Regions:
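Helix-start (N-cap) detector for alpha-helical repeat units in TPR-like alpha-solenoids
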Residues: 9-10, 43-44, 77-78, 112-113
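Position-specific recognition of the canonical hydrophobic site in helix A of tetratricopeptide repeat
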Residues: 13, 20, 47, 54, ...
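Residue-level recognition of tetratricopeptide repeat
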Residues: 17, 51, 85-86, 120
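Structural signature of tandem alpha-helical TPR/SEL1-like repeats
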Residues: 21-34, 55-68, 90-103, 125-137
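Alpha-helical protein-protein interaction scaffolds
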Residues: 78, 82-85
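TPR/TPR-like alpha-solenoid helical repeat scaffolds
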Residues: 85, 112-129
Length: 139
């Protein structure tokens, strides 16, 4: 039997996911913005909006969306990882990104996306750090 969802919020989220999967991020953003007009306190919609904006190469706006989602629900590990990713790869804010990944791991120490992201970020930080002697003696 076909089951219809009566909650439009879920339907909007589903449509956003389908459009993103098809690569139509602009349409997905329109749906998300429309849905937020009637569901402004839905952290999932804000997280989806952040993911879309990041895919559209708008990291500052994506960060705002993730921060709004976290204001609404600070216990969603995915949102912390997404925020960390935007800070790291979109805005080159490595220390802030590290703090976001650490927060995700504080909530769920076994969340592999957070573990992997933190490991990769630490490797990048280490690779870009000047040699020890330059940090001590300059030059």
């Amino acid at each position: 039997a076909i089951k219809f969802k009566t909650d439009m919020k879920e339907a909007h989220n589903d449509l956003v996911m389908v459009l993103r999967k098809k690569g139509d991020n602009k349409s997905a953003l329109k749906v998300c913005v429309h849905a937020l007009k009637s569901h402004e306190n839905d952290d999932t919609l804000h997280r989806n909006k952040g993911n879309i904006l990041y895919a559209l190469d708008e990291p500052e706006k994506a960060l705002e969306a993730f921060e709004k989602a976290l204001d609404l629900n600070p216990y969603v590990v995915d949102t912390w990882v997404n925020k960390g990713t935007v800070l790291w790869k979109g805005l080159a804010e490595r220390e802030k990104a590290l703090a976001a990944f650490d927060k995700a791991l504080e909530i769920n120490p076994n969340f592999m996306a957070a573990v992997d992201s933190r490991i990769n970020l630490m490797a990048e930080i280490k690779a870009n750090r000047p040699p020890f002697w330059k940090r001590i003696f300059g030059g």
